[in-house]
Amino acid sequence: MKKILVTGGTGFIGSHTVVSLLKSGHQVVILDNLCNSSINILPRLKTITGQEIPFYQGDIRDREILRRIFAENRIDSVIHFAGLKAVGESVAEPMKYYDNNVSGSLVLAEEMARAGVFKIVFSSSATVYGDPGKVPYTEDMQPGDTTSPYGTSKSMVERILSDIQKADPRWSVILLRYFNPIGAHESGLIGEQPNGIPNNLLPYICQVAAGKLPQLAVFGGDYPTPDGTGMRDYIHVMDLAEGHVAAMQAKSNVAGTHLLNLGSGRASSVLEIIRAFEAASGLTIPYEVKPRRAGDLACFYADPSYAKAQIGWQTQRDLTQMMEDSWRWVSNNPNGYDD
């Protein structure tokens, strides 16, 4: 049984990964500063897993709390989610993103090495590919020109961790580039609760469904896609969580830098997502087509075959289940974790 430190473990993907880790027989310690999550998730995680999870409230840039965590726990590996993730905000406040995401990751890596912990799984993103001009995205594609400081910060941390591993072969660095996580845990107890107006499609749809927003803005209806709207590779958050566990179990004892795409290999359009959500919820989602957003691509999706070959993982849940689980979460928790 391994003890895993999960940074950002009360966030959307982090919390679902905590559930998956515990289900797989691992022990978990969570570090989160709660800047984009709620303390109220902790009793819900206990309800789902039947376990009390050690929680430290703090920041990955805080060496003191990191040293305390490593001193008080025999940590085997770190799964690193902690970071800011709003693309638009990153354009407006780049220094905030580089300080948090890049400097924070560097402090974390330094304190890991100081504690003798050399296994890290990093939550990266398909945004590091930029616009490669072809689909599907494969791991041998070079990172491109990112369209936001958020994407650049992910690319920079990938490079930093890869360089650290080259300099010190004790390290196992696992870089997971994932696509568009949606859905929620099947219990309806945990899900995505963005602060403010959501940046991503499904939380936006959910807020319209809950009556918090009057209609959905669909950015771009003239893309070269079958229905004119942008197409993305959507992945159920529990599939993504299980991908983290599979990658850690398969590769954390193998020195080197391991890069994997985690996606479904299928692209769905904005209108397809709206229709699928309407079918799951029985509601009608009003929407208005607006001009394209700068930097948005027409279509991208993963080639997931390398992940299947390397770690024996592939997605198990289809679009219908993603929508049903999302609707269960939002209908049971109209105010998120604030109920």
From Swiss-Prot:
The residues that hold NAD(+) are 12-13, 32-37, 59-60, 81-85, 100, 125, 150, 154, 179
CDD domains attached to this UniProt entry = UDP_G4E_1_SDR_e (cd05247)
Q: What does UniProt list as catalytic?
A: Y150 (proton acceptor)
Keyword Zinc annotated: no
Which catalytic reaction applies to this protein?
Answer: UDP-alpha-D-glucose = UDP-alpha-D-galactose
Q: What class of enzyme is it?
A: isomerase
Per UniProt, which keywords does this protein have?
A: Carbohydrate metabolism, Galactose metabolism, Isomerase, NAD
Q: In which pathway does it act?
A: Carbohydrate metabolism; galactose metabolism
For this protein, the record's Pfam families field holds:
Epimerase
Could you say which protein family the record assigns here? Belongs to the NAD(P)-dependent epimerase/dehydratase family.
List, alphabetically, the PANTHER family matched. UDP-GLUCOSE 4-EPIMERASE
Query: What assembly does the database describe for this protein?
Result: Homodimer.
- This one is known as UDP-glucose 4-epimerase
Native organism: Neisseria meningitidis serogroup C
The organism's taxonomic lineage, starting at the top: Bacteria, Pseudomonadati, Pseudomonadota, Betaproteobacteria, Neisseriales
